[in-house]
Design a protein with these regions (language model features):
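A metal-dependent hydrolase metal-coordination microenvironment
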Residues: 1-72, 76, 80, 165-171
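Alpha-helical context
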Residues: 16, 20-27, 32, 57, ...
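Alpha-helix capping and helix-coil boundary motifs
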Residues: 39, 99-102, 155-156
Length: 171
């Protein structure tokens, strides 16, 4: 099944919406990706600065070795830090190491703990609205489905019905 995961916002909450059954050859998806990529490139160096303010001294080169396009994700920061021998005993990284409370999926957990809205290394990217993404997906033959609501809607599940009214078709 052709599909895509797209970042968007609803009521200032960043969400991930899956578009199942889309026409992935439609240029609208590439254009959206290019627009977001430009913003992500600009945010990557800010993320590096914010990460280093937590008591690290990561270098751009360490992240460039993990990134194919110059965008640094929270997962990449987690990977670079956990592999950096200087930080074997760093207190902030202990939960992500073997046997730690966040070690089941350390890179992704590092992302969720430090790089999403409200966390210390979050950098804002202006994403399209939920309504726009639902329309984009539907107009190109797809079905719009909300991804991992437990992470994005923590404590705000009351807005889910509104999102369905906007055209969301699944979870």
């Amino acid at each position: 099944i052709p599909a895509i995961e797209i970042d968007c916002t609803y009521k200032e909450i960043n969400l991930h919406v899956l578009g199942y059954g889309i026409d992935y050859t439609n240029p609208a998806f590439n254009q959206l990706g290019e627009d977001i990529l430009k913003q992500e490139l600009n945010c990557s160096l800010k993320k590096l600065e914010l990460t280093n303010q937590l008591g690290f001294d990561l270098k751009k080169e360490q992240l460039d070795a993990l990134s194919s396009n110059g965008v640094y994700t929270g997962e990449m920061f987690g990977e670079a830090l956990l592999k950096d021998e200087r930080y074997v005993d760093h207190e902030l990284l202990k939960p992500y190491r073997s046997g730690g409370s966040r070690s089941d999926n350390p890179y992704v957990n590092f992302y969720w703990d430090y790089y999403v809205q409200g966390k210390p290394c979050y950098t804002e990217v202006i994403f399209p609205s939920l309504e726009k993404i639902i329309q984009l997906i539907n107009d190109r033959g797809g079905v719009a489905v909300l991804a991992h609501p437990g992470n994005n809607l923590k404590g705000k599940f009351d807005i889910f019905d509104e999102m369905v009214e906007k055209g969301l078709q699944g979870v």
